[in-house]
């Protein structure tokens, strides 16, 4: 994107839902050129939650808990390296975050684990009746957040 003549080199945001929501946080935590983030129900979040009696995030690799023969110590250790919670702790940019209470793909407990790990300025929009999708109001709030961060609104 930095090689494109249309890009001003300053106004860079990451924006996405589910796996895109996860990647929006991961990229922003790794690249200081990102100025703000919009993340809807990020996947890859709190993936070890099942081991502690709560729903874990997509792709639900540990859904069978500690009883799975596939849950080797190496696997459990490696998962933490790409769990979004790990990246959210390092986020320095403002973020708009939104999720719904009825999401079975990326359960609210997993997404709140990410949100609660963020120390940068953050806004939260919870839509109780929403599942694994975004309503137009959520999208509008996300776009408005970006415009506000860039002093365009």
Annotate each predicted stretch with a short phrase:
Residues 26-71, 126, 134-137:
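Hydrolase active-site cap/lid region
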Residues 71-87:
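Active-site nucleophile elbow and catalytic-triad environment of alpha/beta-hydrolase enzymes
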Residues 91, 96-99, 103:
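Short beta-strand/loop motif that positions the catalytic acidic residue
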Residues 93, 107-116:
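Short alpha-helix in the alpha/beta-hydrolase fold that links the catalytic acid
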Residues 112-153:
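C-terminal catalytic histidine-bearing segment of alpha/beta-hydrolase fold enzymes
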């Amino acid at each position: 994107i930095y090689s494109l003549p249309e890009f001003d080199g300053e106004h860079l945001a990451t924006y996405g839902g589910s796996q895109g929501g996860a990647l929006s946080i991961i990229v922003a935590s790794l690249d200081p050129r990102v100025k703000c983030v919009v993340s809807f129900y990020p996947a890859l979040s709190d993936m070890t939650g099942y081991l502690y009696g709560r729903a874990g995030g997509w792709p639900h690799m540990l859904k069978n808990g500690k009883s799975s023969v596939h849950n080797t110590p190496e696997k459990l250790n490696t998962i933490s390296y790409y769990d979004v919670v790990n990246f959210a702790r390092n986020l320095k940019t403002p973020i708009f975050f939104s999720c719904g209470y009825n999401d079975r793909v990326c359960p609210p407990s997993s997404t709140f684990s990410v949100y609660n790990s963020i120390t940068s300025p953050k806004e939260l929009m919870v839509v109780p009746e929403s599942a694994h999708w975004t309503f137009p109001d959520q999208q509008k709030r996300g776009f408005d957040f970006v415009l506000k961060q860039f002093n365009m609104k």
